[in-house]
Regions:
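Helix-coil boundary/capping segments in enzymes
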Residues: 1-121
Length: 121
């Protein structure tokens, strides 16, 4: 059954594993996450997967919520998502990672703000 109206999916995640960008998923023995076991998540999840999983819906746009990227370089996730959007058309908007206790938080926020799909942190 296809939904008869367009939907903005306001919370999803994309990731490509194997590059050390997701310490919580790429550990040698990933521990259960606060939301449960991580075993079902131990694979890449990219726009093609998302389109397959949402094929029954009229997705008008989607919002990627930061996926606990390696906090050593939070701008890298925003940059990767913009490259992904340019190549694949998704996500439509990005909520980025920012840790306010960082000494360089002003630079991190300015860096995120430079990306046009950014909508918040």
């Amino acid at each position: 059954m296809t939904a008869p109206w367009p939907i903005i999916d306001c919370h999803h995640h994309f990731w490509r594993l194997g590059k050390g960008n997701y310490p919580w998923l790429e550990a040698a023995d990933p521990q259960p996450h606060r939301y449960g076991p991580v075993a079902p998540l131990l694979r890449d999840y990219l726009p093609g997967d998302y389109r397959r999983d949402t094929a029954a819906f009229k997705i008008a746009g989607s919002v990627h919520i930061e996926a606990e990227w390696n906090p050593a370089d939070p701008l890298a996730e925003t940059r990767w998502l913009h490259d992904l959007a340019a190549a694949e058309g998704l996500p439509s908007a990005v909520i980025s990672q920012a840790w306010f206790a960082r000494d360089d938080i002003a630079d991190i926020l300015a860096g995120h703000a430079a990306y046009p799909l950014g909508r918040g942190i």
